[in-house]
């Protein structure tokens, strides 16, 4: 028989996972989005097309972590051409949410400074799945896989997959 997979995604990776789950429902047993991104509220998004013509890169985003012991390895600069393409892809992923029918687990922090918490509600409420859960991990910021709540994130992800395998 065909193998089905669980997709576990972080940040922009969630847009990729949502797109895949919408396009290939027969291949996806479940979807986990961690600090998932389908909405960008930053007003600079309206100028992404112009910005990419003016400068090749902008400062990157890193270390949105509450844990003083935590650290994230990230790029110092972010290419503006990639940012424009990312915005276009995110719009498409958001439009594809109603075609996602697999079990869904959404985890996010109300204290995320990188991806607005409204994204969690947009994902949770936007999918067609009847089997869906939203967990807030508010002792952390954006990188919830490395932050204070990381063990809760790992355990919840494990249980979600185990209970649906």
Regions found by a protein language model. Name each.
Residues 32-42:
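Active-site nucleophile loop of the alpha/beta-hydrolase fold
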């Amino acid at each position: 028989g065909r193998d089905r997979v669980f997709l576990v995604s972080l940040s922009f990776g969630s847009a990729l996972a949502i797109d895949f789950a919408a396009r290939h429902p027969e291949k996806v047993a479940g979807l986990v989005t961690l600090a998932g991104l389908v909405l960008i509220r930053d007003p600079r998004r309206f100028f992404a097309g112009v910005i990419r013509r003016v400068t090749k890169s902008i400062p990157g985003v890193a270390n949105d972590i509450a844990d003083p012991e935590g650290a994230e390895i990230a790029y110092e600069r972010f290419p503006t051409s990639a940012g424009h393409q990312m915005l276009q892809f995110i719009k498409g992923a958001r439009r594809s949410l109603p075609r996602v029918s697999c079990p869904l687990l959404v985890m996010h922090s109300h204290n995320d400074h990188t991806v607005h918490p409204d994204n969690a509600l947009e994902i949770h409420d936007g999918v067609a799945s009847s089997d869906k859960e939203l967990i807030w991990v508010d002792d952390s910021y954006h990188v919830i896989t490395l932050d204070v709540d990381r063990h809760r994130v790992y355990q919840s992800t494990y249980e979600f997959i185990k209970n649906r395998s």
